[in-house]
Amino acid sequence: MSEKYKELEKSNNELIKDKNEKEIKAEKLMKKYEKVKQERDSMGDLLVARRLYNEYLEMNTEVKSKFKNILLQKDFESFLSSGYSTSTMDNIWDIVKVEYKNIPSENLEKLREIFKFFIMQMNKKFKDPNFALIEATLEEEFDPVTQFDLSQNSRGKIAEFIFYGYGTLEDKTNSKDEDIIEKIKKRPLVLTK
């Protein structure tokens, strides 16, 4: 009986050792996968950034001149590095707020894309996202607390979404918790009817 017990114990120990080795291999494989995935995502981000930079360069000269000290045009690297700050996002929003009537719709669309891209990229610096884009939905009732009405009606339904707003997110205790905006830094720009 003790002979059989020793064999079973030896077999069990071998299985445990084998299981532990496989867990270590799986963990190493997952780390490699995460690294490759991160590199792939980073390459995708660079391709998107390059496209946005090229589209930015194609904008009207008059529009680009409004952003010349904010989104640097000297080269791709300057453009990219200039976008990774909340002050840049605030400045873009402030200019659009004042100049939206003088910005052609196709350029406004490109600026929205650039703004969204940089907000999303800034989130990648953190384990959990720190910022959220805020949009407005057409035909919903205007909310003066969470939206900025460029038509100065300050009531009625939203007729046009002009530009994103953004806010900071609450810290999460659990990564599966829903994102909750803690503070609105810039409200979405809208026109009401």
Identify the role of each PLM range.
Residues 1-193:
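Extended, amphipathic alpha-helical stalk segments that mediate dimerization
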